[in-house]
Amino acid sequence: MNFLKNKQTRSDFITYGLVILAFLVVFFMQTNHMIPRMFAGQLVPITAYIVMAISLNLVVGIAGDLSLGHAGFMSIGAYTGIVTAVSMQAAGAPQTLALVASIVVGAFFAAVAGFIIGIPVLRLRGDYLAIVTLAFGEIIKEVVTCLIVGVDAHGLHVIFNLKGNATVNDLHLMDGGIAIIKGAQGASGVSTYSTFVAGFVLIMIALVVVLNLVRSRTGRAIEAVRDNRIAAESVGISVTKYRMIAFVVSAALAGAAGALFGGNFSQLSATKFDFNTSILILVFVVLGGLGNMRGSVIAAAVLTILPEALREFSDYRMLVYAIVLILVMICTNSPQIQGFIARFKPKKKGEVEANV
């Protein structure tokens, strides 16, 4: 148990333990029908948003790059995951296998997209990087609205509907064929296959991958690039390489989250992955704390549940939501409040001796 003497390792295991405990409590309540229906329907989206927050925190909090197009990678994962799952289920594959395959495929294609986009984008920094990632996120959203995809005995049929005059009938599917993606209508008529358990497993995978990456030599190099780019270059650290690693890993996790998210809806359109979604995920990261993965998990869960909890106050729901966000930001950044909280934290041995 010597490895637990390390403060960072203990913190990571506390994070794992809290997530596992929360899952067990929610799973017990779910199996015993103790969760209201409107909240039960949000369990899979909550897990997907948590993974999205963890993945974006890797780029924004650890690498120090502001990305505003993260929902674009989520949409790639969602659409490729749906196509994979429906195709496998049509071929007779079990639902669990189709779900796992959809997540893997979604992560792969999102990672490839992240690498391709990262080549030109990661030469920029600051506001320029934010603007370009925002543009790429919107481009990805527009591209997926042009896709018409179906599957039959002959395999996949794909039409890229640039002119906007193609329809599902142009796929010429055989009898028994399934139209999966219908252009601007998105995916519709698809049976749902995502589960809360799969979402929990994906959260744990995301936490293990990101936290181990951050604690590794690669993670320290990424943080060195964030803190002082010139100093990092002077000791031989490749700035572009390590920024690319963070960007691609983040994109892959976003794609996996998108595949999980897409499998929770029988109808899914590209409007679910617009600029507002990217900003929402960024809010999770900022409120949870830049570089704080545990905070991202909590913020994503609470802020996803909050609008549903306030649904009874339909006229004032978004007003209350905004007030809560403002109060959290004030409390998080207030030195007085932080000092008050610090009084209740146990002091380290060195600090106690110094006070004596």
Language-model segment annotations:
Residues 1-356:
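Transmembrane alpha-helices and adjacent helix-loop boundaries
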